[in-house]
């Protein structure tokens, strides 16, 4: 969930990614039970810190028309991908625009997957860099790994590998050294900004321009091979199939009425997954789409112990994100936008998308 409009005129120094992260206060068992009762207990004090920006209202994405996505048909039989993963149990492949979309919009369902012993393969399409470069993107990646550690109850190191896919894309994959049923794969494409117009530091281009054909290709911020629209679709389809999913979770697609006001990157990724999932052999009913920013307009449905645990996970991530961070549960819940989203989580099936 990248929520920065434009880089500030004088960026402050980024936090050292090697700095010790917040120690988790684990309430995982409470989340895994799937019970949400009562109010948030014993909110601790703490000051909300905006290192780069200050907001008084939740962010809202610009509505930009998006061209239809036409996936390239896969060869049959499908060649084995270098990204192919070991078969798992009740496997979910989760495809998100930014590192933290899952812990904000799809929790406590996300924690339930991890706590149940099922297999989870997560893919982040953009770097969520907000025009601030690879170092900042890597801090966000470290934050999401820390959040997963909080949910799984381990602090063992993660192994890192670079993979070149059949599509020609190069991705980075992280796998816990003690838990191979989990993985995080990142493409590191440039953040598209709330405006959908990208950032000056990355050529003012993002997923919206790529899909609409106003730029011919996007260059990952880690200097990986450039991807045009068809190669991006091939890459996402390849990664989905490589994860051997029983289920897919992702952002709400652009063509849904629930996408109005969402981050343009969220809409692009949701539409991309919706287009390529059938090519990857996934039935429409196996895909769940999570409402992003507009979830704030829905009734609160995450409360009590489930909210406590969700906020713990988010605060663990936020301790690594030097742009917007919160110190304690009260501060996280007071943060414009984040406080509303953390109290809500709405997944929609294909039949519930309200397609426009």
Regions found by a protein language model. Give the residues of each.
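N-terminal secretory signal peptides
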Residues: 1-25, 36-41
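N-terminal twin-arginine translocation
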Residues: 22-65
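Active-site rim/loop-helix segments in enzyme catalytic domains that contact anionic ligands
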Residues: 58-242, 313-323, 330
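Active-site environment of divalent metal-dependent phosphoester hydrolases
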Residues: 102-104, 129-130, 255-259, 297
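Short, flexible/disordered intra-domain loops and linkers
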Residues: 133-140, 257-266
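The feature marks non-catalytic terminal segments
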Residues: 170, 222-225, 243, 262, ...
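Proline-aspartate-enriched helix->loop->beta-strand connector
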Residues: 236, 240-254
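Catalytic toxin/effector domains delivered as secreted proteins or via bacterial secretion systems
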Residues: 249-250, 257, 269, 273
